[in-house]
């Protein structure tokens, strides 16, 4: 007997990146920060007592929300803490979209968006990005034409790393007749000289919700802690109505608060990633790859064409992925339109990146 709802029977679940258990693997496939979390986080963990686990955590994670409010110069009521960014995405759909409504996503993008939409019985409107991964002048028009009440835009974009300027996001939010979720999972790695600050949109508009996570920039992917920033009309119903009870635990609240307080330490790792990003992009270009301009902690690299044995760069990309894997290096290969001829490569440490480049050069020579 099958007890699943019909829409669950029809759907395909989210496919996570490989998480190897064997030692020695160079893991450049899931966009984790290659550097450890700050000493303040380690000290906070060591300072916890077993007694701290006996009672339930703060229901609203108020200590963390206060620190986040100070960091972003907003009020505590503009913040919600969640068990990873994925919980916030679920909350947004649960709170603001009726079953059967349309949810718009920029295509290609984070593959969990359509999965969550299907779980909630929503129609997915896929709005194609331009060839250069930009949204295009008519993006807002296409969003509204889809009838979507909710739209997801990841910025910097995944999987390309392209950064959409705040001015374009402001215009999009002003034209879109629904809730615009700006997923800023990778924003910590943006060049500070660009002075990018989409949080200003929260002060100006009531339909913008920004997702931030501690998984990437703060080296806490294993903690599962994120937060949303938005107008109180967006935050309040999630915070007081649709959020799970005690949705973030005692340990994660303490460590996340310590991490955000020690932002200066985390910023040192962001600069290291930016320097390595530039070095790896330059080296890949010299090898014949084409890298999309990235402001994230990864590069989307189109492989150069192989010799006559290979009918397409799609096959060449898959071959490079497999040979890297055979040599203990994991990158991400997406078997989907517009991405089959590319590899998404997380920026690792200097030594990890150097080994990656050596193996890619060997792979190209063999082909």
Question: Where in this protein do the model-derived segments appear?
Answer:
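Phosphate-binding glycine-rich loop
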Residues: 62-102, 120
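PLP-dependent aminotransferase class I/II
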Residues: 60, 207-292
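Conserved PLP-anchoring active-site segment centered on the Schiff-base-forming lysine
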Residues: 95-116, 130
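N-terminal "arm"/small-domain region of PLP-dependent enzymes with the aminotransferase-like
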Residues: 1-55, 70, 147
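Active-site phosphate-binding strand-loop segment of PLP-dependent enzymes
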Residues: 125, 131-190
